[in-house]
Amino acid sequence: MKKITGIILLLLAAIILAACQANYIRDVQGGTVSPSSTAELTGVETQ
């Protein structure tokens, strides 16, 4: 049973990371998305 919950947690973490990465890339490319808090946390300066 613990193995299943571990796999689910890994999947959730991967999904969250992918979503954050997509937002970060859009911010860097100057997309329509306003600079997210993640960009500020990573020390990326927005223009």
Swiss-Prot record:
Lipid attachment, kind S-diacylglycerol cysteine: C20
Signal sequence range: 1-19
Gene Ontology CC, one term: cell outer membrane
InterPro entries, alphabetized: Lysis_col
GO biological process assignments: cytolysis
Keyword Membrane: yes
Source domain of life: Bacteria
Its membrane topology: Lipid-anchor
Localization terms from the record: Cell outer membrane
Covalently attached lipid (N-palmitoyl cysteine), positions: C20
Protein keywords: Cell outer membrane, Lipoprotein, Membrane, Palmitate, Plasmid, Signal
Function per UniProt: Lysis proteins are required for both colicin release and partial cell lysis.
Stated name of the protein: Lysis protein for colicin E7
Gene: lys
